[in-house]
Design a protein with these regions (language model features):
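Short, flexible helix/strand-to-coil boundary loops that buttress conserved ligand/catalytic motifs
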Residues: 138
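Extracellular beta-strand solenoid repeats
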Residues: 68-70, 74-76, 80-82, 86-88, ...
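Terminal amphipathic alpha-helical/low-complexity segments used for targeting or macromolecular assembly
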Residues: 3-66, 72, 90, 96, ...
Length: 219
């Protein structure tokens, strides 16, 4: 749950019928082990498939969703993959990072410290650090994309692409609740305008409101 600036993870201790931790240890970090699917997860993961690495069962949701750790990706320490989020390639989440609501980390992207990733895509060598929040917009449903070697310590929300060597500081907030795509690449800023915004549509008729009667009062 996320609210009031405080993130609280609620993890069920019910029997895990989604995955199991194998004895296949990570070559560099032997305290990490691969997971194996116990059932089909979406259309891509079949029962028996090996996944990425975790430190404990608490790193990956055991709920009936499609969250999964692929390839050589890692979820370690108190980090948590939840609500259809996925890790690919050599992505890493660690510390108390929380990745949820269909978010995807690929290549060598990293979420660390207390980063909160909701619905966003991180690729390349992108980093989410500190108390950063990378969030989909509740208004448009669109989510940020982080790529290159960018680092985010602050808040990014909506259809925002952070690329190159861009750094978003902890006190900075970049929010886009429009249909356009906002692009930040180093010191450069640009916009990809949504084509639908250049079209005019007839105004929808509105129900006329009845005027209050004048009960003997002067106008």
């Amino acid at each position: 749950l996320w609210g009031g600036g405080t993130l609280t993870l609620v993890k069920e201790n019910a029997m895990n019928e989604k995955d199991e931790i194998t004895d296949i240890a990570h070559e560099k970090y032997p305290f990490l082990h691969r997971v194996r699917a116990l059932r089909d997860i979406g259309s891509e993961v079949k029962a028996g498939d090996l996944g990425g690495f975790v430190e404990s069962e608490s790193n990956l949701s055991t709920e009936d969703d499609m969250s999964w750790i692929y390839d050589d990706a890692i979820a370690a320490e108190n980090a948590y993959v939840d609500q259809n989020a996925r890790l690919f390639g050599k992505a890493v989440i660690c510390g108390c990072a929380y990745v949820s609501q269909g978010a995807a980390l690929s290549a060598e992207a990293r979420a660390e410290d207390s980063a909160y990733i909701r619905g966003a895509d991180l690729c390349g060598h992108a980093r989410a650090s500190g108390h950063s929040m990378i969030l989909n917009s509740p208004d448009t449903g669109k989510a940020p994309v982080l790529s290159g070697t960018c680092v985010v310590y602050g808040t990014v929300m909506g259809d925002v692409h952070i690329a190159g060597k861009t750094v978003i500081l902890s006190e900075e907030r970049v929010s886009n609740d429009t249909p356009d795509t906002l692009i930040l690449n180093g010191q450069e800023r640009s916009v990809i305008r949504d084509s639908s915004r250049d079209e005019l549509a007839p105004r929808q008729p509105q129900e006329k409101q009845k005027k209050p009667r004048n009960q003997g009062r002067d106008r």
